Amino acid sequence: SHTDAFAVMHRGQLVFDWFDGFGAADRPHIIFSITKSMAALLAGALVGRGTLDPENLVTDYLPELIESAYYGATIRHLLDMQIASGFSEDYTDSDGIFMAYRRAAAWNPVEEGGETEGLRHFLTQMPKSDTASHGQVHDYCSPHSDVLGWVIERVGNDSFANQFSTYILQPCGASHEGYITLDTYGAPRVSGGMCLGLYDLLLIGEMVRNRGYANGREVVPASWIDDIFAVRDNHIWRGQNQPEGPRLFTNGNYRSLWYQTGFKDQEICAIGIHGQWLWINPQKQLVIVKMASHDHEVDSTIDRVMLAAFAAIGDALS
């Protein structure tokens, strides 16, 4: 499965770790869309501090987006990927809106003779949907998390990286450097550009398992974490056949940029392309991190093998 690093924590104790390929104990590894879930934890910390309200409109914080698809959307819509837009998350796109997005974020080079005005200018141009309304669809769209990152920088009056370090990494006891990719103008790609060490991501997962607490202090409000785990109506989620999530977790849901699996142990997880996983099983008191370098963005066969592996590990430790 092209695994670079793998670790298991059970009841707060590291019981297994393994490295190969690009993995090393002291080397940050890109976590791709797990970055989204990390951003949601930071958003929760800011909600707890009273600087962010998830029911406020996106444009209350970012009036720059008033002409975009984000007009009329709330922060909660961002968090649950229930924004109606004309964006398509298509990794095969070589010259359309998804490629324009990647170029704006400085993840792909600008074509010869071309130019980009950066990620945030791209977000101001996000096309509206002609067929749906906010809150009526689950539409996995990476740029929505970049908007959340912009909101976080606006309300915190500091960079996303500094705030994540101050409010999440340090309180969890992280011991290695982390970083996040930036566009040409310094905007972070909060949708997928974070790189963290294996053990530090494991500690964040353990904080989530412990309802937001780490090292004797509240890092993220317990109410925020409980809401991520809470079972709720999932008809919007089940009505979609785009993205991979609904196919893996038919009875699951998506809350605050985390996947609810709908499995018997009420596991939640964060997933990144090319094989990144953060798996939390509250019933088995289990946290698992897998970092990898899959050849393809999404590999359903390997994903299902990993789900079976996570279940087997939980059964073996219970």
Regions found by a protein language model. Give the residues of each.
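A short, well-structured edge-of-sheet supersecondary motif
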Residues: 1-23, 285-289
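Short, small/polar residue-rich loop motifs at catalytic or cofactor-binding pockets
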Residues: 1-3, 27, 273-274
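Active-site SXXK
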Residues: 12, 30-54, 78, 148-152, ...
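Catalytic-site signature segments of enzymes, centered on catalytic residues
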Residues: 25-26, 90-93, 101-185, 189-192
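Active-site helix/loop module of the DD-peptidase/beta-lactamase fold
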Residues: 30, 48-90, 155-192, 196
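Active-site-proximal alpha-helical segments within enzyme catalytic domains
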Residues: 81, 144-151, 192-213, 276-292
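Active-site Gly/Thr loop motif
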Residues: 175-179, 226-287
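Structured C-terminal helix/loop/strand segments within mature extracytoplasmic catalytic/sensor domains
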Residues: 267-318
